[in-house]
């Protein structure tokens, strides 16, 4: 993160913020990667006018672990008295969940005199996500998994020992445009000072979603080292 003036008078200045991070998550085989940069440019021709261009770009090739585990084997021990290892990952070995964000806009204000000041803020943002994941959905004996063919194939005595899993294939794009314009008025009536803020704003948002879900193979909690299938085997 660094900033500086581009001229001796301070009329033009900039700021550049960046981030790069890569780490292994707690769950086995899960990674987190994030890269971001946020350039900004400011123009101040005088002490009454300020214009700042803002932008932000972020890419996350891997967002980390996506899933959840039941109380069996975590909060409560399994029937064999053991618990799942803390790095247990019930997902497929090739789960993917990526995200990409970008934003551009500006902030402008100008003071006409001691009474009137105008401000305007404009933003355009876009967020894209892509996910192909298998995740836990409670033990097979849970009534919520009554429609799972994989759980139904198990013997009743085994259903409490197997983790039901679902899969999700999801591609989303969210776009947002907003602009607001404000007029600030300062005046007095007798001994009372007033500040009146008036304005108008506009926002448009669109979200495109292409997704589907379903049940995947269940996992035996008594043998958590059994490798889950690759994503795509059953989809």
Predicted regions located by residue number:
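Short loop/turn motifs that connect adjacent beta-strands in outer-membrane beta-barrel proteins
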Residues: 7-12, 47-48, 113-115, 188-196
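P-loop NTPase catalytic cores that bind/hydrolyze ATP
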Residues: 116-121, 126, 179
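Outer-membrane beta-barrel translocator/receptor signature
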Residues: 1-37, 45-49, 102
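Outer-membrane beta-barrel transmembrane domain signature of Gram-negative proteins
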Residues: 1, 191-196, 200-235
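Composition- and surface-driven signal marking solvent-exposed, interaction-prone regions
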Residues: 30-31, 121-123, 134-136, 195-198, ...
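Acidic/polar loop-and-plug regions of large Gram-negative outer-membrane beta-barrel proteins
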Residues: 21-25, 38-44, 48-111, 115, ...
């Amino acid at each position: 993160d660094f900033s500086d003036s581009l001229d001796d008078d301070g009329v033009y200045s900039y700021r550049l913020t960046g981030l790069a991070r890569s780490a292994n998550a707690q769950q086995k085989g899960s990674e987190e990667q994030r890269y971001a940069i946020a350039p900004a440019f400011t123009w101040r021709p005088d002490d009454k006018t300020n214009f700042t261009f803002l932008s932000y770009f972020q890419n996350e090739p891997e967002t980390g672990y996506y899933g959840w585990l039941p109380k069996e084997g975590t909060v409560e021990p399994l029937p064999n008295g053991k618990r799942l290892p803390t790095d247990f990952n019930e997902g497929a070995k090739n789960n993917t969940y990526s995200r990409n964000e970008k934003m551009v806009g500006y902030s402008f204000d100008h003071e006409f005199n001691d009474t009137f000041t105008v401000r305007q803020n404009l933003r355009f943002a876009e967020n894209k996500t892509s996910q192909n994941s298998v995740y836990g959905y409670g033990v097979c004996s849970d009534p919520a998994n009554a429609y799972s063919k994989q759980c139904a194939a198990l013997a009743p005595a085994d259903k409490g020992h197997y983790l039901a899993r679902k899969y999700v294939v999801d591609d989303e794009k969210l776009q947002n445009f907003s602009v607001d314009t404000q007029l600030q008025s300062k005046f007095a009536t007798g001994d009372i000072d007033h500040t009146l803020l008036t304005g108008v704003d506009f926002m448009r948002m669109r979200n495109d979603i292409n997704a589907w879900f379903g049940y995947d193979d269940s996992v035996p909690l008594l043998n958590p080292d059994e490798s889950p299938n690759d994503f795509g085997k059953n989809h």
